[in-house]
């Protein structure tokens, strides 16, 4: 299977005007099976990726599990590349991810990764961002993506 943008479903989300879906067309893969519904939009020069936490995303303390926050961050790197960058997110890979947890995520509120591209070269995308819930910060991060061209069938 060629990894092209066609593996994503990113059309308008009728339940959230101004937002687009960010889902893999195969719901049995990680994004859909673990993260659930994801929506995204451009906000000026930034990208916002939103998830809707469920009980399965909580840890024993009743807050959003750190692994879920990390997964949202990783997915947001590729959303950023697609929404405000120039690369094909499908065949790309995460090279580096640095995260600082700042606070616990409330599972009753949407969780957003807000990102910006610091630099984009022919092969790399440097992204930084924050995970937020309204005015509350959950994490800060930076990451590097390695772009690859789509594989031929």
Question: What do the PLM-derived regions correspond to, one by one?
Answer:
Residues 1-153:
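Terminal targeting signals and extreme-terminal segments of soluble enzymes
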